[in-house]
Amino acid sequence: MYAVIKTGGKQYRVQAGDLLVVEKLEGEPGAAVAFGEVLMLGEGEAVTVGAPTVDGAVVSGTLLETRKGEKVKIFKKIRRQGYRRTRGHRQFESVVRVTSVAGAGKEAKWEGTIDLTPKVILDARARGLGDAAVPATIPAPVEAAPAKAEAAPKKKAAPKKAAAKTEEGEA
């Protein structure tokens, strides 16, 4: 069973067990997410199209993480003027595991398990370092370096002598 849902201004075709990357959703990792705006349901040849949505249809999922997406580069240029500007932008996105598609008296569930292990630990395991290589907490801030010994004060230049006054009329 599959469904076409609308979220974040875009439409997605999903079925139970799919991993879905959508615009940013509010919530912590592991939170349940429900998409109520189901535009179409289908199973084999049987298709139910909503007008505009299918009544009573719900797609449920679990929020796995919220992250930044790929960088989009913005480049502006005015030729022959020496004007060039480069900027970048990374949009927030959420990763959702679809756990069930329900509607029209039917329901399709995903029977797998959801792993919320942080990416740092997964990377350490992939490199063969194991979980022991990953610190359990964020390390404490590094202490400030000891102050340097003060250097000897610089000698001041001797004041300039005033020019000798001459009296007029002396010869």
UniProtKB/Swiss-Prot annotation:
Quaternary structure note: Part of the 50S ribosomal subunit. Contacts protein L20.
Residue runs in coiled coils: none
GO cellular component, one term: cytoplasm
GO terms (BP aspect): translation
Protein name, entry field: Large ribosomal subunit protein bL21
Keyword line: Ribonucleoprotein, Ribosomal protein, RNA-binding, rRNA-binding
Biased amino acid composition, Basic residues: 154-163
Similarity comment text for this entry: Belongs to the bacterial ribosomal protein bL21 family.
Single annotated GO MF: structural constituent of ribosome
Function: This protein binds to 23S rRNA in the presence of protein L20.
Entries under NCBIfam families matching the protein: L21
Annotated signal peptide: none
Originating organism: Caulobacter vibrioides (strain ATCC 19089 / CIP 103742 / CB 15)
PANTHER family given in the database record: 50S RIBOSOMAL PROTEIN L21, LARGE RIBOSOMAL SUBUNIT PROTEIN BL21M
Gene designation: rplU
Annotated spans, Disordered: 144-171
